[in-house]
């Protein structure tokens, strides 16, 4: 495992030298004392960042933790990047794992947080919920991000959910809010028809 970490660090440094872009396995974006955080990877990160920017202007303590390198998974880097103030976390996976207890990223995040708490590395264990998005190429827009942050604010959030995907079989779909983003976010215009 240590050898993998050395190879990872060398590869990330080589990439930085070649491109001028420096990445870490996990990168945090948002309020430094965030209480609600979404953890995810991939192309949906940009949408989350834009919604976080708007929510920060409204005084909300939110953020997004971007997974830049999933394997080998580094619990150390995850814990360093996640604000200690966080009270609730939504882990979003773009996959469905039939027969599994939960999706892969969710399981890794839960394990990292639980072990850190058990080892005394964290004083509190945030509430962690897991969601699926983007299955069957379903759109993941600003309304989906708003729905996830709203769910994190709920007194009893769903432990498992889907967002942007209408699921009338399991009824795990989060309701999508109206677009409340300012007009300047015209490139984030929401669809006028419901997700199906």
Predicted features and spans:
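Peripheral docking tails and interdomain loops at the edges
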Residues: 88-183
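Glycine-rich phosphate/diphosphate-binding loops and the adjacent beta-loop-alpha structural elements
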Residues: 4, 24-27, 33-42, 188
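Solvent-exposed alpha-helices and their adjacent loops that cap or buttress functional pockets
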Residues: 29-33, 81-83, 120-122, 181-184
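Single conserved hydrophobic/aromatic residue that forms the stacking wall/gate
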Residues: 2-3, 7, 187, 192-196
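Redox- and metal-dependent alpha/beta enzyme cores, enriched for Fe-S-associated oxidoreductases
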Residues: 33-60, 73-78
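Short glycine/threonine-rich loop-to-helix capping motif typified by GTGT followed
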Residues: 42, 53, 73-84, 102-104, ...
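Conformationally flexible catalytic loops at phosphate/diphosphate-handling active centers
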Residues: 1-4, 8-27
């Amino acid at each position: 495992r240590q050898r993998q970490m050395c190879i990872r660090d060398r590869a990330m440094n080589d990439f930085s030298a070649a491109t001028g872009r420096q990445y870490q396995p996990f990168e945090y974006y948002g309020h430094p004392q965030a209480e609600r955080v979404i953890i995810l990877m991939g192309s949906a990160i940009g949408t989350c960042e834009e919604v976080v920017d708007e929510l920060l202007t409204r005084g909300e303590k939110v953020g997004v933790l971007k997974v830049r390198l999933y394997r080998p998974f580094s619990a150390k880097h995850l814990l360093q990047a996640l604000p200690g103030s966080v009270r609730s976390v939504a882990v979003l996976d773009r996959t469905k794992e039939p027969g599994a207890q939960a999706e892969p990223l969710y399981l890794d995040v839960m394990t990292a947080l639980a072990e850190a708490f058990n080892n005394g590395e964290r004083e509190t264990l945030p509430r962690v919920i897991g969601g699926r998005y983007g299955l069957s190429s379903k759109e993941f827009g600003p309304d989906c991000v708003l729905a996830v942050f709203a769910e994190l604010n709920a007194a009893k959030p769903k432990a498992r959910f889907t967002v942007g995907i209408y699921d009338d079989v399991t009824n795990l779909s989060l309701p999508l809010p109206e677009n409340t983003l300012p007009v300047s976010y015209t490139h984030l215009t929401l669809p006028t028809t419901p997700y199906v």
